[in-house]
Curated annotation (Swiss-Prot):
InterPro entries: EF-G-like_DII, IF2_II, IF2_N, P-loop_NTPase, Small_GTP-bd, T_Tr_GTP-bd_dom, TF_IF2_bacterial-like, TIF_IF2. Residues 94-108 have a biased composition (Basic residues). Residues 262-265 are annotated as: G3. The lineage of its organism: Bacteria, Bacillati, Bacillota, Bacilli, Bacillales. One of the essential components for the initiation of protein synthesis. Protects formylmethionyl-tRNA from spontaneous hydrolysis and promotes its binding to the 30S ribosomal subunits. Also involved in the hydrolysis of GTP during the formation of the 70S ribosomal complex. It is found in: Cytoplasm. Residues 316-319 are annotated as: G4. This is Translation initiation factor IF-2. It comes from Staphylococcus aureus (strain JH9). Keywords: Cytoplasm, GTP-binding, Initiation factor, Nucleotide-binding, Protein biosynthesis.
Length: 705
């Protein structure tokens, strides 16, 4: 007979697993997690503790019910007495109203006389912001500006009313008046991250649904698993078995809601998947039992570990005859995911997304992990969260799918989403139903924003639409400035991209060195670089450290700075970072020349040469209406690829040169067909194919200079 586990015992008593774990730890019993089996003596000790408490609670509830009935009878008698007292008081108040009218008339005649205003007291403590002026500081101290200016003059500082004061000067003046000063830290309201707070310490925070991300390799069954959980078919509408966008769905299991994010499993969507891991509480790693660990599986593990998110492994396709779940477990141990049965802490759930076997076990494990994590949020706070996806709809305008992480989102709320803003016009849940409110961990699609945000952007709700508009516009302007800054200046890394658009191909260079001889030698060497069609323009040379004026010149001329045995000063460093100017520091002349030359070669228009990659012989032809002539071919040399250029050769003479229209193997489209295999080929705008023709495939390859 198998031993009872902690979570099973907790379920029996309607308690949380964490309560049982805490009690066991207080008994000095080592506990790893909620899946640990309980010994008989441990169960007896827990029974004494928890079953006694439940009996006492039942007794107290019956006593409280008796007390409530007695109190209700007493309250009825008291209410009758109170009504009589209220009637008597109302009669007395009528007489008082007449006296009040007479008093008001007398007060009108007694007008106050003009008296000189009493001098304001100097406060004991004053707060100030960075850059406060003499006039502003005088107002805070309740003194004349001239008095502050006089004190500054005695300290040897000549200042006027609009002069900014530094911290040291402010403290000197404050000491003279015996006032304590404190610098006020100004919070940048445009930084949306400041509105995201940890809700674990909030006394009003309540339990929220877990946000679960399903990750894994392409075609391992992520969307089919979601399909089984939601009982709806979404796989059929997807192209090539790859999820097109991150979708968010919410389901209910055992009275508790769970929110699922479906991230794309293809390697091209790595960034989007990483964003999904940042908002999730639990990761479901789907691994096919017949395929094992694949490249995207490893990427998903790394994303989850970086985000410090617990992983539950769903071993899918166990109903296939070639499935081998033990192999999957063995392979995952190399990445630190060790099953509980093998002494580890990772939960493995074998299942079949197609048949639905094991789905209930997976949902139960999600619930247990979420319970241990104690996920909380405060619905009373301002709504904040993350953009899951966004698009521009022809009929509705910009729309965004949001995940509410804290607070409650309402229709009509003023909102800032990334660099966009607006007022929520409509809100739709994952079932397509219009809703008015959305609490924590709820996915919704909204309309009413002025532009399309980026997936992964954060959103914050503000009480005032003007404030939301101001912050949104300010963030938008800041992003434009940043984009211009990033794309404006040339660097050796983006030299080819910057220069290839114009006909004139120049590289402006500023050289700074430790001695004049080095500067002249380096300038002469750079001028000797012989790359066709590219000019090196040395616009400034000098001896000494790189300074701020060098950076200003480089920024104005869209050039780069080369420092030979010299370093930039602090002002130049700050300016270079602000203006995004490329500075290259070297100690060997050869390294400078090599780096510049390799960057300049990218400026030239690339040269290509033709490379034959394969040949196919036409064995049979088929004429099909609306398609044209289909050639049944046999690949005799190399390979035929879908994107290759082709020549039709008949009796050694080239009949036609063009491109492939279709390449098929049996009835399926093929990317390439290798030597020794048959395929079907159609040529774009050419139907005069005959048996015995040779189709030669070629590619254009760039020549390295």
């Amino acid at each position: 007979m198998s031993k009872q586990r902690i979570y099973e015992y907790a379920k029996e008593l309607n308690l949380k697993s964490k309560e049982i774990i805490d009690e066991l730890k207080s008994m000095n019993i080592e506990v790893s997690n909620h899946m640990q089996a309980l010994e008989d003596d441990q169960i007896k000790a827990l029974d004494k503790k928890f079953k006694k408490e439940q009996k006492n609670d039942n007794k107290q509830s019956t006593q409280n019910n008796h007390q409530k009935s007695n109190n209700q009878n007493q309250n009825k008698g008291q209410q009758k007495d109170n009504k009589k007292n209220q009637q008597q008081n109302n009669k007395g108040n009528k007489g008082n109203k007449k006296n009040n009218r007479n008093n008001k008339k007398n007060n009108k005649n007694n007008k106050p006389q003009n008296q000189p205003a009493a001098p304001k007291e100097i406060p004991s403590k004053v707060t100030y912001q960075e850059g406060i002026t003499v006039g502003e500081f005088a107002d805070k101290l309740n003194v004349e500006s001239s008095e502050i200016i006089k004190k500054l003059f005695l300290l040897g500082i000549v200042a006027n009313i609009n002069q900014s004061l530094n911290q040291e000067t402010i403290e000197l003046i404050a000491d003279d008046y015996g006032v304590e000063v404190e610098e006020e830290v100004v919070i940048n309201e445009e930084d949306l991250s400041i509105y995201f707070e940890d809700e674990k310490d909030d006394p009003e925070a309540i339990e929220r649904p877990a946000v679960v991300t399903i990750m894994g390799h392409v075609d391992h069954g992520k969307t089919t698993l979601l399909d089984s959980i939601r009982h709806t078919k979404v796989t059929a509408g997807e192209a090539g078995g790859i999820t097109q966008h991150i979708g968010a769905y919410q389901i209910e299991n055992d009275g508790k809601k769970i929110t699922f994010l479906d991230t794309p499993g293809h390697a091209a969507f790595t960034t989007m998947r990483a964003r999904g891991a940042q908002v999730t509480d639990i990761t479901i790693l789907v691994v096919a039992a017949d395929d094992g660990v694949m490249p995207q599986t490893i990427e998903a593990i790394n994303h989850a570990k970086e985000a410090e998110v617990p992983i539950i492994v769903a071993v899918n396709k166990i109903d296939k005859p070639t499935s081998n779940p033990d192999r999957v477990m063995q392979e995952l141990t190399e990445y630190g995911l060790i099953p509980e049965d093998w002494g580890g802490e990772t939960i493995f759930v074998p299942l079949s997304a197609l048949s639905g076997d094991g789905i209930d076990d997976l949902l139960e494990m999600i619930g247990l992990v979420a319970e241990v994590q104690e996920l909380k949020a405060n619905p009373k706070n301002r709504a904040v969260g993350t953009v899951i996806e966004a698009e521009l709809d022809k009929s509705r305008g910009p729309s965004a799918s949001l995940l509410v992480q804290n607070g409650t989102l309402n229709v009509g709320d003023a909102i800032v989403v990334g660099n966009t803003y607006g007022r929520i016009r409509a809100m739709v849940n994952d079932l397509g139903q219009r809703i008015k409110t959305a609490g924590p961990s709820t996915p919704v699609e909204i309309t009413g924003i002025n532009d399309v945000p980026q997936a992964g952007d954060r959103f914050v709700v503000f009480s005032d639409e003007k404030q939301a508009r101001r912050i949104g516009e300010s963030r938008h302007e800041a992003s434009i400035v940043q984009q211009r800054q990033e794309s404006k200046n040339v660097s050796l890394d983006n030299l080819f991209e910057q220069m290839k658009q114009g006909e004139m191909k120049d590289l402006n260079v500023i050289i700074k060195g430790d001695v004049q001889g080095s500067v002249e030698a380096l300038a002469a060497s750079l001028m000797k670089i012989d790359v066709e069609g590219v000019n090196v323009r040395i616009i400034h040379t000098a001896v000494g450290a790189i300074n701020e004026s060098d950076v200003t010149l480089a920024n104005a001329s869209n050039g780069i700075i080369i420092g030979f045995n010299v370093r930039p000063d602090s002002g130049a460093k700050r300016a270079a970072e602000a203006e995004n100017v490329d500075m290259r520091l070297h100690r060997v002349i050869y390294n400078v020349i090599e780096e510049i030359e390799s960057a300049m070669k990218g400026l030239l228009d690339p040269e290509f040469e033709e490379q034959v990659i394969g040949q196919a012989e036409v064995r049979q032809t088929f004429k099909v209406s609306k398609v044209g002539t289909i050639a049944g071919c046999y690949v005799t040399e190399g390979k035929i690829t879908r994107n290759a250029g082709v020549r039709i050769i008949r009796d050694g003479i080239v009949q036609y040169e063009g491109e492939l229209d279709t390449l098929k193997r049996f009835k399926d489209d093929a990317k390439e067909v290798a030597k020794g295999y048959e395929c079907g080929i159609t040529i774009e705008n050419y139907n005069d194919l005959k048996e015995g023709d040779v189709i030669e495939a070629f590619e254009m390859v760039e020549i390295k200079r």
